[in-house]
Structures are given as C-alpha cells and as structure tokens.
Amino acid sequence: MTRRSWFLLTSALAGCGSKPERSIDPLPENVAGVWRRKEWHDMPLSEAPDPVPQSSLRRFESALYQGPGVIQARAYQLTSKAVGLELAQRWRPSADTVFFWAGDWFIVLKWQDADRTALQAFTREVEARLNTAPAR
C-alpha cells in the first residue's frame, strides 16, 4: 500500500465511531420570548422515564423552563419518523401534560401553573423549530 492509500484509509476510519453532533437544540435557552431554560441535562438513554423504546432512541434531553409558570420538558430524538408516529398514536394523555411529534423528535411537556397562551406559544415555537430542522 502506498502512503497515500494509508492516509486515505486512516482518514476514513477516523470519522467512524464519533458521537453525532447536535444538529439542532430541541430545548433552546429562550422560547417564545417569556420562557427561560433554568436547567438542562443530556440524559443517558437508559434513564428515559417514558414508554419510549430505548432501541428507538438516539438522544434524550431534559430541561426545566420558568416563565409564566413552570415547564418540565423532555425531548427524545428518535431513530425514525415511524417511531414518532407510533408514539403519538399510543401515548396516554395525562393531566397538565402535552406531547407532540415533530420530525425525528418526540416532545413531552409537563407544566405547573402555566398561562395557557404562553404554553401554546412555547409549544408552537418548539414544534416549528423541530419541523424546519434538516433531516438526519
């Protein structure tokens, strides 16, 4: 093998196995002008508390927002859009919780004492942001 072949082979292999970069921040620092992220955690997939199959997850994030109320947000990056559709169809509604599927993300928002209009603005902005994200 020539030096050039070794260099190309080494370069190609160096790109393998690296952690995928974040293509978009599903839970940004500021949302809808009134919600501020106070905590953010990149969670291990094994700690996903919801009925999302771990084999269908690429990433799991959690964040706490304060504004006109409190929102606990969980964002699941899925391996396929089909998984998102299935989750959206089978998810069980619960009090003070909203969920939605956008692109390859499934988002669960649980709120406390939140202003409904501000909560709707939060949901609309995050959903629009994820639906305009480049496909992976």
Features from the language model and the residues they span:
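N-terminal "mature-domain start" segment
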Residues: 16-68, 114-136
